[in-house]
Amino acid sequence: MEYDAAERVLLGLDRSDGRPARASAAFLWAELGEPGSELPFVHVAGSNGKGSTAKLTESILREAGFSVGLFTSPHLERLTERIRVDGDPIAPDAVAAFVERIQPWLAERAAAGTEPAFFDAITAMGLWYFARKEIDVAVLEVGVGGAEDATGIVDPVASAVTSVSLDHTAVLGDTIADIAIAQAAVAPPGDRPLVTGATGAGREAIRTAAADIVTVGSPAADADTSDEQPDIIARYDGPTEAMDGLISVSIPEGVIEHAAFVDGMTFDSRLALLGAHQARNAAIATTLAGQVVATVTGSADADESERTATTRAIDFDADVIARGLRTARWPGRFETVDREPLTVLDGAHNRAAIDALTETLSAVPFDDLHLVFGAMDDKPHAAMIESAPATDSVVTCRPRLARAADPAMLARCCENSGIEQVTVGERVDDAFATACDRAGPTDCVLVTGSLFVVGEVRSLLNAQSVSTDGERHGRPDNKRPQPTSR
């Protein structure tokens, strides 16, 4: 079987959002013999920031010497992005081999009316591939929620809920507490704590749902006064001229057991991912990585003589962590793809994510802002627009997805919020070209509202010079991109 045929089989499965998938994924995983079940897993849930946190955790662990599998969603451009080993996407021939292996089983399930959903199959493929590649540890990003998510078929050694906000309410519940409780289901078994960056009602609901928690966030003087002081402190000192963030992380002595820093740790780092929320995600990732190291070495204080042969090469200290954070790249999250005009791609897809984007952008100098906005149909569009940065012009658009929102409806939301120059677009590439044409060299073009919109813009820019790790090195002669023909 060729890759293209295998991809069609996978994309032909049910892709509806929020379908309970844990039992279906477990059924398929069992059919495969539960490959990878012996691996130490890190499980990352949350309304926002779970993908960034998963990537940061993976980067720290790789810097420490582990071979790491990373499972994330959605993909921006190619399905193979969702499953990576040591930074490399799953090989196309492996995708073909997996689909060929399960195709008879899929046919049986389809005949019985119990065919798995797309995300079930992708989750099983990730675990199958990680087992084939003989990795040391796997980091899994939850799809939706936690309790019934397909990724919940594994038993993690470390878990986190990055944040809690109103998102996927049709599946997870209408309140912050409902959503937090669903996400807290990723808590590791036994006496290991669940790490969380949630605040307010979300944090309190997680506290009641999990046996033990470790809280992460900004210091109380900078945080919501209703919140207690976090156990682990993350500070964000703003962006540099090079468009990376300055952060510091402080882990007090004794705040967390079963981790490689029981004596405490404080360090500074640069971060390619901008924003105070990313500083918090970096601190969560550091905590998760420390739990993994302690698990694999067998002791939080294991010295070189105590380590087994399989962990002898592991190196974990503040310098290693800072290098892992500094080198992590995560496309589509405040990703700067040009400087003249400043062009930023950010997949913020709910009000809380737009709030974080607005705060981050406020520290970046530019003149006028030109927004390219598209979203899914089930999102709070008016609230997202209200939370967006002050905007001089907007072009709405529709990504190539059945559940994308109507651009005309999005335009009405923009007009109702008081934005004067609003253009109803359709195709993402045309909308992006229009915004770029409007922008002067000292302006900003911001693409946001959905990772699917961001993914289409990244595909449009693929003809430009793009490094293998997702960094972009500018456009020839500083020209604005033109939409590709289809």
PLM segments and residue spans:
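ATP-dependent carboxylate-amine ligase catalytic core
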Residues: 17, 22-37, 63-154, 170-173, ...
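Acidic, Mg2+-coordinating active-site environments of NTP-dependent enzymes
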Residues: 138-141, 161-264, 268-272, 282-319
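Charged, amphipathic alpha-helical linker segments immediately N-terminal to NTP-binding catalytic cores
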Residues: 1-16
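A conserved segment at the C-terminal end of the G1
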Residues: 40-44, 52-69
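Residue-level signal for inorganic ion chemistry
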Residues: 10, 47, 68, 139, ...
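C-terminal helical cap/extension that packs against the catalytic core
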Residues: 201-205, 209, 342-343, 382-444
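Nucleotide phosphate-binding/pyrophosphate-handling subdomain across enzymes
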Residues: 137, 150-153, 157-160, 165, ...
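Short, flexible loop segments at boundaries between secondary-structure elements
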Residues: 399-403, 467-486
